[in-house]
């Protein structure tokens, strides 16, 4: 984008600059209480429905060899690059609903992240729920922990000053939950992280896009992930 050398320095040059993705135009929305199935097909005439089927394609690349293929069930990516990239699929408007993900994530060298990644506005916040990672340099401020989905996550906060964002060059905070026992499949109970962040004074605003993303730089690797409600 998610796109982003310290956890946050990395997530800065990467995460911050990665906020220039491509999106699929929604044609409909989804039930207020559920995420739609991943199919890139959206209807458009029900004001009582809020979330469309997965309708957002994150494809941020700055160079190198990155082969990214979204599908009707998720996405796959292979990379060999010193430059940063962030790819994945999700929703134009994020929410606190759970997200299911599953598949492979392998990093041969360099840094790689597998995360739920998104932004909010008012306040402008870039956030990660990091499920797996390889060789990221952790920096920023540790704010606390949260237990969710069978593991403990360490919560970090970082402030980015005059960096690229979904609103252009701006100053904004990053909220990052890092799972201490990494996994490549499971359910992310997003609400648990939002609640934990809020309890620590880390407040989100209006939801912007939200994706299951793979991000990498400085090496090679591959991933194949399915995404669903």
UniProtKB/Swiss-Prot annotation:
Disulfide bonds: none annotated. It is an enzyme of class 3 (hydrolase). Pathway: Glycan degradation; xylan degradation. The keyword Nucleus does not apply. Its EC number is 3.2.1.8. Pfam families: Glyco_hydro_11 (PF00457). The active site is at residues 126, 215. GO terms for biological process: xylan catabolic process. GO terms for cellular component: extracellular region. Residues 52-228 form the GH11 domain. The keyword tRNA processing does not apply. It is found in: Secreted. It comes from the Eukaryota. InterPro entries: ConA-like_dom_sf, GH11/12, GH11_AS_1, GH11_AS_2, GH11_dom, Glyco_hydro_11. This is Endo-1,4-beta-xylanase 1. It comes from Hypocrea jecorina (strain ATCC 56765 / BCRC 32924 / NRRL 11460 / Rut C-30).
